[in-house]
Regions:
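Intrinsically disordered, low-complexity regulatory segments in eukaryotic proteins
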Residues: 1-2
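Alpha/beta enzyme core
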Residues: 6, 10-11, 16-23, 30-55, ...
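Active-site flanking residues adjacent to catalytic metal/cofactor-binding acidic residues
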Residues: 79
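Short acidic/glycine-rich loop or secondary-structure boundary segments that cap or lie
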Residues: 181, 207-208
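Interdomain boundary/hinge elements
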Residues: 198-203
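Active-site loop ensemble at the mouth of alpha/beta enzyme cores that anchors a bound cofactor
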Residues: 209-231
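Conserved small/polar residues in nucleotide/adenosyl-binding loops
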Residues: 234-236
Length: 236
């Protein structure tokens, strides 16, 4: 199996891309504002094999909590941001090693640029995330439905937006609950970019069926040498 070689990206004390090992990422389900509970869960996940942790940052209080959380953990922390660009900026100011955004739901170009400017200043990578469930109406119409091609075009449009702002310290994430659509999308995007790819299958169905879908999808994608970090919902 020949690996799809991508750019190297540093996330805290961890490197992904290039010839670095595929990093296992998981996510917390605590309220990030609850520092004690969040740290305890991250430590359990670390012990179980997690190498990068993602925390939701839905409020300014959650962003502020990252400072103390970071002091107590040993793995890189990714801040998951939706809608409010100010939370992305606050998360970076409070120590996030990477941020996950969808530029399409952050707002205007000016707001995206405000986030990019802080990331550039602090050399913090941005994970550009696109989900089939929130694909732009224009792309759904163009491809006559939600398709792998539409997902890839959406992701690459957002990558270009940030690159045009003079920043290319990026990781790309494309997801769908349709396993084969997700596999095809990864095959397509790997031919179009050398940015590292974060691989995960959107959760759907019961815990068991969701795990089966995830295992099949991840296996098919990784078997083609595609992927630099994977999302694993580790059970502790």
């Amino acid at each position: 199996m020949e690996r799809h070689i991508t750019k190297e990206v540093q996330i805290g004390n961890r490197w992904i891309g290039g010839n670095h090992p595929i990093a296992i990422q998981s996510m917390t389900n605590t309220k990030t504002e609850d520092v004690a509970a969040t740290v305890a869960q991250i430590k359990q996940l670390t012990k179980a094999g997690c190498e990068i942790i993602r925390c939701a940052v839905p409020t300014q209080e959650a962003a502020a909590a990252l400072t103390e959380i970071k002091k107590q953990i040993t793995i890189p922390l990714v801040a998951d941001i939706h809608f409010d660009y100010r939370l992305a900026i606050a998360a970076m100011e409070h120590g996030a090693d990477k941020i996950r955004i969808n530029p399409g739901n952050i707002g205007s170009r000016e707001r995206v640029k405000a986030v990019v400017d802080v990331a550039k200043e602090r050399r913090i990578p941005i994970r550009v995330g696109v989900n089939s469930g929130s694909l732009e109406k224009g792309l759904v119409e163009k491809y006559h439905g939600v398709t792998a091609e539409g997902i890839v075009e959406s992701a690459m449009d957002k990558v270009k937006l940030i690159e045009d702002m003079g920043y290319d310290n990026l990781v790309i994430s494309i997801k769908s609950s349709d396993v084969m659509m997700c596999v095809k999308a990864h095959e397509l995007i790997a031919k179009q970019t050398d940015h590292p790819l974060h691989v995960g299958i959107t959760e759907a169905g019961t815990l068991i069926s969701g795990n089966i879908k995830s295992a099949i999808g991840l296996g098919l994608i990784l078997n083609q040498g595609i992927g630099d970090t994977i999302l694993s919902l580790i059970h502790i």
